[in-house]
Amino acid sequence: MNANVKTFSFDRKKVKAGILHFGVGNFHRAHLEFINSQLLETGPDMYGWGICGAMILPQDERIYNVLKEQDGQYTLTVCGRDGNNEAYVIPSLIELYWGYRDQEAILNKIADPAIRIITMTITEGGYNQEKSTGRFMLDDEKIRHDLGDPKHPVTAFGYIAEGLRRRRDARAGRITILSCDNLQHNGDTARRTFTAFIEAQDKDLAAWLKGNVTFPNSMVDRITPATKPEDVKRLNAQNGTRDMAPVYAEDFIQWVVEDNFAAGRPAWERVGVQFTDDVTDFENMKLSLLNASHTLLSYPSFLSGYRKVDEAMHDERIVRFVRAFMDKDITPYVPAPKDTDLEEYKQTLIERFANRTVSDQIARLCFDGVSKFPVYVMPNLIKMIRDGKDLTRVTYLLAAYRHYLKYHIDDRGISFEIDDPWLTDNDKELIASDNSRAFLHLSPFQSTDLEQSDNFSAQYLMFVDAIKEKGAMKTLEAII
């Protein structure tokens, strides 16, 4: 290990788990684990807040085995916008279980009075909601399994319900469930979906839940690319390490949390976490500017032949497109949170997207558009249609999304595979249709009838034809 790889000096052997985390993916390891390692460094009074990881998916086996072999530790490389990187050994993950090997251990951990917070990164799609209504889908195959076989769960809902049942029976006390997923009102979403599942399974437990579990909202932010095999080699060479589970992320990090904890909490404010009574303005700013802009640039950039975000954001045409979207389409609907300079925030976003040392994959941004459009794009689009705003950039985006899903080929003639796992059978029929209007009835757009807006429909149809005839970039050039 190179001398410049930083280590934390707290006594790891004295740290006990006070947090159980579901979903030990790259973002969690670059965000909460980094924050918590910094917290543990502040003093022994925080040693009761180590993290126990719970991995419950079949595909988690490889990374579980690697992390177990590495005693839960790994390197995080923080990539500076100035081109300078800093690497850390992250030690706050002190226990780790995989559901296909350690199911009882995970369930009993939820019932352990030492565990006072359950955190989660289970992705936008993991909350099992119908895209257009937000209804919890009780007819999902895995959900039906967990409803019928509570003691052998396969979903986060099943695990947490059975664990809470044991916690209640053991009189182990109240607990907080804290979503760290990139959803607006993620705590409200968690409360609604977990309540729906538990009410369908055990009404007595549902009554206990209401009085003993809190679900704070939180806003998380740190761009964390997927780590590919070539990244593993590069990071190990750069850091002088032999780490089979490294992660890398940008230098920006933010976490804003509603201060609503049922059984105490770590003093995360010591290391820069912002606590507030209401995270709404922070959520709106981040989801409407960062996430919506990511979606806006993803499909046009990918169709134009770009594969890395930083490369696309060094194309002045795309920068102008994204900045116009931020300034003209989004800013009128985003009140700045207290003590936040919105102009500075937008400029920082442009710099973050262009960070060459992070070099995020555009394919990651394109992934699961069905889950992203309802959260990041549709709320403001509905307001824009209502207010008679210029719809040029958003209609172009939807036309580009259709082209991406339908034709699987970019402007250079290079074919690609799409990755949108939540497309329904009906969605696939609408995409395959030669009637371009049919696409406007795709499941992520069902919160409003886009076809009823003549202005929207006309512009969208024009861009559908233009992208097919001239390509995504040539079409974009005409509107910036």
Provide a role label for each language-model segment.
Residues 1-480:
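Substrate/ligand-engaging "lid" and interaction regions
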